[in-house]
Each structure stands twice: as structure tokens, then as C-alpha cells.
């Protein structure tokens, strides 16, 4: 999967289209990512010792990795490619040519 935790991405599809945020978690087995402030859902929590009343908590839901594009340091969104630099495999932005790792 071309997206890693900590990458800055732009959402390119869905209700949050155009949003730029940071990847909080990558889920490679299901090809999904959790992006900060995107795809918020309301989760009902049962009452417990910490919260005797229970609560409705907003949290980020995973979105499919095909709905995001990785941004480079200059904010250019593009597809991700791989190349070998100094004997090390690195990711780079195909549009700008800038190395991401």
C-alpha cells in the first residue's frame, strides 16, 4: 500500500472531497486508511466507570485508500511511485518527482 501513517493526503472522493489531513492509521489488509477529521461517525458508548452516563463519541472511520492522494512537501498531489536511490527503495511523487520518504 502506498500510504503510510503520518503522510499528508488529500481526499479525492466522497463527502469530504478536497480535505487535506494527516493519516492516523493505515490498514493494509483491507486497503483502508484512517484520516484525521475525515469520515466522522457517531459511536454510542455504554455507561462505564469513566463515564457513568454513557456518551455519543465522534470518531474517524476508515476510508478506502483509492479515495486519497499523497501530498509532497510543496502540497502537490500525485500518484506514488517507487525507485532506488543510493541502494534504498524510496517512494516519490510521480507528478513532481519529489521523494516522499
Curated annotation (Swiss-Prot):
Which species does this protein come from?
Streptococcus agalactiae serotype V (strain ATCC BAA-611 / 2603 V/R)
Cited function: One of two assembly initiator proteins, it binds directly to the 5'-end of the 23S rRNA, where it nucleates assembly of the 50S subunit.
Record's keyword annotation contains rRNA-binding: yes
Q: Which UniProt keywords apply?
A: Ribonucleoprotein, Ribosomal protein, RNA-binding, rRNA-binding
SUPFAM superfamilies in the record: Translation proteins SH3-like domain
Q: How does it assemble?
A: Part of the 50S ribosomal subunit.
Q: Which domain of life is it from?
A: Bacteria
The record's annotation in PANTHER family points to: MITOCHONDRIAL RIBOSOMAL PROTEIN L24 (PTHR12903)
Q: Which GO terms describe its molecular function?
A: rRNA binding; structural constituent of ribosome
- InterPro entries for the chain: KOW (IPR005824), Rib_uL2_dom2 (IPR014722), Ribosomal_uL24 (IPR003256), Ribosomal_uL24_CS (IPR005825), Ribosomal_uL24_KOW (IPR041988), Translation_prot_SH3-like_sf (IPR008991)
Q: Which GO terms describe its biological process?
A: translation
User: Which family does the similarity line name?
Assistant: Belongs to the universal ribosomal protein uL24 family.
Name used for this protein in its record: Large ribosomal subunit protein uL24
One GO cellular component, as annotated: ribosome
Does the record bear RNA-binding in its keywords? yes
